[in-house]
Regions:
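Short beta-strand scaffold segments in enzyme catalytic cores
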Residues: 26-39
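Zn2+-dependent cytidine deaminase-like catalytic core
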Residues: 40-124
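Short, basic/aromatic recognition patches
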Residues: 1-25
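Gly/Ser-rich catalytic serine loop of serine hydrolases
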Residues: 23-28, 96
């Protein structure tokens, strides 16, 4: 998939989800398998034991981990694609590059990782 194809296909799904969030930083993570969305995650500001186990400084859950928890166990290990979106209140792209902790474990479980920044979609 090209970057343009990813934007055209998945942005219409991610943008309304992001814009509906009441948080200032509206991160949405989509996990894709065979061009289908199999999991959606968002930043969650409540404690979860996986966040501390993976080495996060706080117990808040990032959108990548929230989405990955929803992936069926039968698909873990397959060629999954992670796409992170973040939009400002005007609907423009903002930086949603995975933090260093997310980047480390995501690099081990995802075949490809994409994220938005002020210039559009980038590949990690």
């Amino acid at each position: 998939m090209t970057l343009d194809t990813i934007i055209e296909t998945y942005m219409p799904i991610a943008k309304p989800l992001s814009m509906a969030m009441e948080r200032q930083k509206k991160h949405i993570s989509l996990i894709i398998f065979k061009r289908k969305i199999i999991a959606v995650g968002q930043n969650i500001f409540k404690t979860h034991p996986d966040t501390l186990r993976l080495g996060y400084r706080t117990a808040d859950m990032h959108s990548e981990l929230d989405a990955f928890r929803k992936v069926p166990k039968s698909l873990r290990g397959e060629k999954l694609i992670l796409v992170n979106f973040r939009f400002n209140r005007f609907g423009h792209f903002r930086n949603s590059k995975p933090c260093s902790v997310c980047a480390k474990w995501c690099g081990e479980v995802f075949h490809k990782i994409y994220y938005t920044d002020d210039n559009g979609l980038q590949r990690l």
